[in-house]
């Protein structure tokens, strides 16, 4: 294309040179210059006038060439650019073909196991919506189906968090069923529910003992009641001891991940790239720091629960029943405090201990008293709070009201809570 254009330009230039107009107009700018003295002939026998005409012809040629050459070069470059634009995207597109199919491993995981993830709602049977007349939602969370006949695994704090409630489960296809709580281990924060449905999609259980730091994982659940929400990340640690997290009476090495785990997807599965549950989403401390209960520990709980059911009784362990406040909390250990201070400028630099309020149940005494997620409890009834055990001890006290000192950002505040009797 470029060569053909150059050939045509040469033809045009030759025709212009042969044209009388070219020779007649070329001398105009040089007419004021003096002629060769006496008009004597040169060494070739031509007169000075002929020599002058020759010089004018040469200069006219150079002017015309200098005028047209930039356009010729521009045409060549433009042709090259057009040719490159014609072919480069085609080559790039051909190289990218199939990448969605070959490299979307997260989507493959979700497609294989999302149907076994459920949304769990806790309804308060004492408070009703003004317009619908239905019980209001006190709390929500996630779970996943582990048996085709309707057995569901979740966190204990998702379902055992408030008296006078009922549990509803919504499947991935939108169907909703009432659920009964079968087994509870509040020490490890695990529970099972059952709905009266058969032939359900089941989540496969993997092995958490073979996990390595840096492995990709996917957290599935229903944060903010948005079913089948997916977050992804990597395993940050496979051996985060419960003592490091300040969790009372728990002998668990938690999985730490940077996949986002929130209120709604706690209780849902943490899944490896083979589509197997390798943990139960449990809690989030801050952005990039979340924890899950390893599936190997969960299997021990399920085996004990199955043995109890064979004997005709339910498997229930945990703390003695205390008065109810309505929060999920986490002890601020030195390691967790260091992480929080490094990630947030709103953390007081002199804070050395306390309990982080991770979740507040709607309609609970804590909610009515003004506690909010993210508050840090430092004192209750003038007693220093260093871990979650101190909060349980305060609930066991006979005081009617709890005067709680909290930090909300860098601001210190007082709230008063009246716990409910069991």
Curated annotation (Swiss-Prot):
Membrane topology: Single-pass membrane protein
Known EC number: 3.4.21.108
Predominant place of localization: mitochondrion
Gene Ontology MF, one: serine-type endopeptidase activity
Active site: 157 (charge relay system), 189 (charge relay system), 266 (charge relay system)
Subcellular location(s) of the protein: Mitochondrion intermembrane space; Mitochondrion membrane
Serine protease, as annotated region: 139-302
Residue ranges annotated as propeptide in the record: 18-74
Transit peptide boundaries: 1-17
GO cellular component: cytosol; mitochondrial intermembrane space; mitochondrial membrane; Nebenkern
Pfam families, per the entry: PDZ_6 (PF17820), Trypsin_2 (PF13365)
GO terms, biological process: apoptotic process; ectopic germ cell programmed cell death; mitochondrion organization; positive regulation of apoptotic process; proteolysis; spermatogenesis
Annotated motif IAP-binding, positions: 75-78, 94-97
Biased composition (Polar residues): 41-51
Quaternary structure (record): Interacts with th/DIAP1 (via BIR 2 domain).
Membership in a protein family: Belongs to the peptidase S1C family.
Known function: Serine protease that shows proteolytic activity against a non-specific substrate beta-casein. Promotes or induces cell death either by direct binding to and inhibition of BIRC proteins (also called inhibitor of apoptosis proteins, IAPs), leading to an increase in caspase activity, or by a BIRC inhibition-independent, caspase-independent and serine protease activity-dependent mechanism. Can antagonize antiapoptotic activity of th/Diap1 by directly inducing the degradation of th/Diap1.
Protein name as annotated: Serine protease HTRA2, mitochondrial
Organism: Drosophila erecta
Classification lineage: Eukaryota, Metazoa, Ecdysozoa, Arthropoda, Hexapoda
């Amino acid at each position: 294309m470029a060569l053909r254009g150059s050939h045509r330009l040469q033809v045009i230039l030759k025709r212009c040179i042969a044209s009388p107009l070219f020779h007649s107009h070329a001398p105009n700018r040089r007419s004021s210059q003096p002629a060769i003295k006496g008009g004597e002939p040169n060494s070739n026998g031509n007169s000075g006038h002929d020599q002058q005409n020759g010089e004018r012809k040469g200069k006219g040629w150079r002017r015309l060439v200098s005028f047209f050459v930039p356009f010729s070069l521009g045409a060549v470059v433009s042709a090259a650019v057009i040719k490159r634009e014609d072919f480069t995207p085609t080559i790039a597109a051909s190289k990218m073909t199939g990448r969605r199919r070959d490299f979307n491993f997260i989507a493959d995981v979700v497609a294989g196991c999302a149907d076994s993830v459920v949304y769990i709602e806790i309804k308060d049977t004492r408070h009703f919506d003004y317009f619908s007349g239905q019980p209001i939602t006190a709390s929500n969370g996630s779970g996943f189906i582990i048996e085709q006949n309707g057995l569901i695994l979740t966190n204990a704090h998702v379902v055992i968090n408030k008296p006078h409630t009922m549990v509803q489960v919504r499947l991935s296809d939108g169907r909703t069923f009432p659920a009964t709580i079968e087994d509870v281990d509040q020490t490890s924060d695990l529970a099972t529910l059952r709905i009266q449905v058969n032939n359900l999609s089941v989540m496969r259980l993997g092995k958490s003992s073979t996990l390595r730091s840096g492995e990709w994982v996917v957290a599935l659940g229903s944060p903010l009641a948005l079913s089948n929400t997916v977050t992804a990340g990597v395993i940050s640690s496979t051996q985060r001891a419960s003592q490091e997290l300040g969790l009372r009476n728990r002998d668990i090495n938690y999985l730490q991940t940077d996949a986002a785990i929130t209120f709604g997807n706690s209780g849902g599965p943490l899944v490896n790239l083979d589509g197997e549950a390798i943990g139960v989403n449990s809690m989030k401390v801050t952005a990039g720091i979340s924890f899950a209960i390893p599936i190997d520990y969960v299997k021990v709980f399920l085996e004990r629960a199955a043995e109890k059911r064979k004997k005709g009784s339910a498997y229930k362990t945990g703390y003695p029943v205390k008065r109810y406040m309505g929060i999920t909390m986490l002890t601020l250990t030195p390691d967790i405090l260091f992480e929080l201070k490094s990630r947030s400028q709103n953390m007081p630099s002199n804070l050395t201990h306390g309990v982080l309020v991770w979740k507040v149940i709607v309609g609970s005494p804590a909610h009515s008293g003004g506690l909010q997620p993210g508050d840090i409890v430092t004192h209750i009834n003038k007693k220093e709070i260093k871990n979650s055990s101190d909060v349980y001890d305060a609930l066991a006290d006979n005081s009617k009201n709890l005067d709680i000192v909290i930090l909300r950002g860098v601001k210190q505040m007082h709230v008063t809570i009246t716990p409910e009797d069991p």
